Amino acid sequence: MDHDKLEANLLDHALTKYLKSTKQLDEATVPKHVNNVRGFILRIIYRHGSCTIKDILKEVTLSPSATTTALNHLEQEGFIERSRNNNDRRTVWITLSESGRGAAEQMIENRQQLIDGMFERLTAEEKKTFLAIIAKLAQ
């Protein structure tokens, strides 16, 4: 196995382990009908406070129709609320309801617990280096 494949496999393994762990935590602490996609959308809305579907589409890899379907489910389940912009009726603002905010906060807390657990094994210098690398990759 060449060097690049080893690195790719290592990164893939780490990401898979992280995603599996977050899924298990979410399944134990978040309402069952909030799947990964809907949870991701809830966390996007949480970060924005209030946003439009265009704002969400900038951050997801879903089609506009799949995003709208997920938002429809979240609205039916009482996790989000939609309201029209009084100045431009074409613009629909999306905000979290109380239950949506609670679910998003729980998912964020779940991820923070996992990251805290992972970072316990690292020195301060290793954490700093790791975060610098992640920031560079995310650019």
From Swiss-Prot:
A Pfam family recorded for this sequence: MarR
Keywords, ordered alphabetically: DNA-binding, Transcription, Transcription regulation
Chain's gene name: ywhA
An individual GO BP term: regulation of DNA-templated transcription
GO molecular function: DNA binding; DNA-binding transcription factor activity
DNA-binding region (UniProt annotation): 53-76
InterPro entries registered for this protein in UniProt: HTH_MarR-typ, MarR/SlyA-like, WH-like_DNA-bd_sf, WH_DNA-bd_sf
Gene3D superfamilies for the chain: Winged helix-like DNA-binding domain superfamily/Winged helix DNA-binding domain (1.10.10.10)
Coiled coil spans: none
Cystine pairs: none
Domain HTH marR-type: start-end pairs: 8-139
Domain of life of the organism encoding this protein: Bacteria
Name assigned to this protein: Uncharacterized HTH-type transcriptional regulator YwhA
Organism listed in the record: Bacillus subtilis (strain 168)
